[in-house]
C-alpha cells in the first residue's frame, strides 16, 4: 500500500527514509490503490522546482480533476518536491526505484527540466520509460518543439528561454545579433548588465552562450572535459566586453541574481539585460515593472529549455498518465500556463487569449538552444569568478 499522502511538500523524516532505503518515494501499489474513493482512477504526478512551479501545478491538477474532459475518469494527485531543500532529488529517487526493479509504483508521470531529463536518462536509460504513442496524445499533433534528450520518450509541454529585456523608450531598435549587441554596448557604455553566473540562470546563459558561440554545436550539450581547453577564446570575448558593463561607484558591477538586473532595468540604471522571458512578462503583467520593458531574441540565441513529461515503465497508471499529458497540451491548460507563469505555449495560440503576453508569440521554440554541460558548469563559474568577476 502507499504511504499516507503528506501533501505536496515532503516532511524531512519521509525524505530521510527514502534516502536510507535507496528506493525513493514511489511506493508499490496494491490493486486497490489506483482507484480513488470516488471510483476514479488515481494518477500520481511527480514534479520539482520553486514555489511558483508548485503553485501552477496545484492549479493545473485541480483544473484537470474538476473541469477537464477526464474529470469523471481520473484523479491526479500531486507529489511536489521543492528544489534547493538539500533533500534527495527527484531524479535520484526515480532512478533508485528503477534500479531496484520496483513495479506498480506511484511514479505514474514525472515532470522534468532539461538538465534533470538528461540526468535521469543517463542514470537508468530510455528503456525505463514508455515509448510514447502519439495517437494517445492527440493534442501533441501541432507541437513542433522536440526534446533534444530522449525525444521518443519525453513530451514537451511548455518552454522558457533567456532573452534580452530592454526599455523600448531608450532602445527603440534593439540588436538582432550578438555582433550588433556588442556594437550597442560600445556605443552605450554602462547601460548593459548581466548577473554573475552562479547567482541566476540568465547570467549563466549569457556568459556560457557567449563562450560556447566559439565552440562546435555538440559542445553545448556535453559534459566532456575536453571542451574546457577550448574555452579560452570565449573568455577573451567576455574580457573584451567587460569595460562596457554597468558601473556603480566608478567600478564595474555584476548584479546578484536575475532580479538584480531586472530591478536595474526597471529603475532606469541600465537599458538592457539578459533575463528569463517568463520572469519579465509575468512581472510586467502584474505591474511590478514598467510596461515599456519589452523582450527580444538575438542570433545566435541565448539558451532556453523545454519542460517535458515522461511515463516510467514502473508506474501503475499508464492510461491515466497519457490523459494528463494530453490535457497539458490542451488550450485549457496552456492558457493557465500563460496567464499564471508567462510560459511559452507549445500549441497554436490563434484561439488563445494572449492579451498582455503578445511577446510570447514572437519566440520561436524550435530554435531554442538547450545548454546542458553538467559538472562543467561548476568549473565554468569558478573560472568566470577568477578571470572576469575579479577584474573590477
Task: Mark where each language-model region is.
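Short, low-complexity disordered leader/linker segments with a strong preference
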Residues: 1-44, 392
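Early extracytoplasmic/lumenal segment of secretory-pathway proteins
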Residues: 38-118
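Extracytoplasmic ligand-binding site segments that recognize negatively charged/polar headgroups
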Residues: 50-55, 114-260
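Pocket-flanking alpha-helical
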Residues: 84-128, 137-151, 279-286
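Periplasmic-binding protein-like
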Residues: 141, 160-162, 235-241, 289-310
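Oxyanion-binding "anion nests"
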Residues: 253-284
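Conserved C-terminal helix/tail region of periplasmic/extracytoplasmic solute-binding proteins
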Residues: 263, 366-392
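Mature extracytoplasmic/periplasmic domains
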Residues: 302-371
Amino acid at each position: 500500500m502507499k504511504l499516507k499522502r503528506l501533501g505536496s511538500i515532503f516532511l524531512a523524516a519521509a525524505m530521510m527514509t527514502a534516502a536510507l532505503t535507496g528506493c525513493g518515494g514511489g511506493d508499490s501499489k496494491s490493486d486497490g490503490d489506483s482507484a480513488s474513493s470516488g471510483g476514479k482512477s488515481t494518477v500520481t504526478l511527480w514534479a520539482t522546482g520553486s514555489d511558483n512551479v508548485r503553485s501552477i501545478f496545484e492549479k493545473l491538477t485541480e483544473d484537470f480533476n474538476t473541469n477537464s474532459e477526464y474529470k469523471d475518469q481520473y484523479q491526479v494527485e500531486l507529489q511536489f518536491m521543492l528544489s534547493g531543500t538539500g533533500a534527495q532529488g527527484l531524479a535520484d529517487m526515480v532512478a533508485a526505484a528503477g534500479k531496484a526493479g520496483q513495479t506498480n509504483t506511484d511514479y505514474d508521470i514525472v515532470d522534468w527540466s532539461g538538465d534533470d531529463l538528461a540526468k535521469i536518462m543517463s542514470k537508468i536509460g530510455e528503456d525505463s520509460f514508455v515509448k510514447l504513442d502519439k495517437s494517445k496524445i492527440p493534442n501533441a499533433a501541432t507541437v513542433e518543439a522536440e526534446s533534444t534528450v530522449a525525444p521518443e520518450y519525453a513530451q514537451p509541454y511548455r518552454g522558457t528561454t533567456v532573452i534580452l529585456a530592454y526599455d523600448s523608450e531608450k532602445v527603440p531598435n534593439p540588436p538582432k545579433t550578438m555582433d550588433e549587441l556588442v556594437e550597442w554596448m560600445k556605443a552605450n557604455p554602462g547601460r548593459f548588465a548581466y548577473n554573475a553566473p552562479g547567482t541566476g540562470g540568465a547570467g549563466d546563459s549569457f556568459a556560457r552562450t557567449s563562450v560556447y558561440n566559439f565552440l562546435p554545436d555538440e559542445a553545448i550539450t556535453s559534459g566532456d572535459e575536453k571542451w574546457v581547453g577550448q574555452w579560452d577564446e570565449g573568455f577573451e570575448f567576455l574580457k573584451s566586453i567587460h569595460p562596457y558593463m554597468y558601473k556603480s561607484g566608478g567600478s564595474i558591477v555584476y548584479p546578484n541574481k536575475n532580479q538584480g538586473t531586472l530591478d536595474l532595468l526597471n529603475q532606469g540604471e541600465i537599458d538592457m539585460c539578459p533575463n528569463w522571458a517568463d520572469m519579465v512578462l509575468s512581472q510586467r503583467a502584474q505591474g511590478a515593472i514598467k510596461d515599456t520593458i519589452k523582450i527580444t531574441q538575438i542570433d545566435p540565441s541565448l539558451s532556453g529549455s523545454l519542460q517535458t513529461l515522461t511515463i516510467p515503465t514502473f508506474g501503475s497508471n499508464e492510461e491515466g498518465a497519457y490523459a494528463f499529458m494530453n490535457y497539458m497540451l490542451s488550450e485549457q491548460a496552456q492558457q493557465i500556463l500563460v496567464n499564471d507563469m508567462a510560459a511559452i505555449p507549445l500549441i497554436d495560440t490563434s484561439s488563445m487569449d494572449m492579451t498582455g503576453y503578445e511577446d510570447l508569440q514572437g519566440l520561436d521554440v524550435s530554435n531554442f538552444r538547450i545548454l546542458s554541460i553538467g559538472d562543467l558548469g561548476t568549473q565554468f563559474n569558478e573560472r568566470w569568478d577568477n578571470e572576469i568577476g575579479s577584474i573590477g
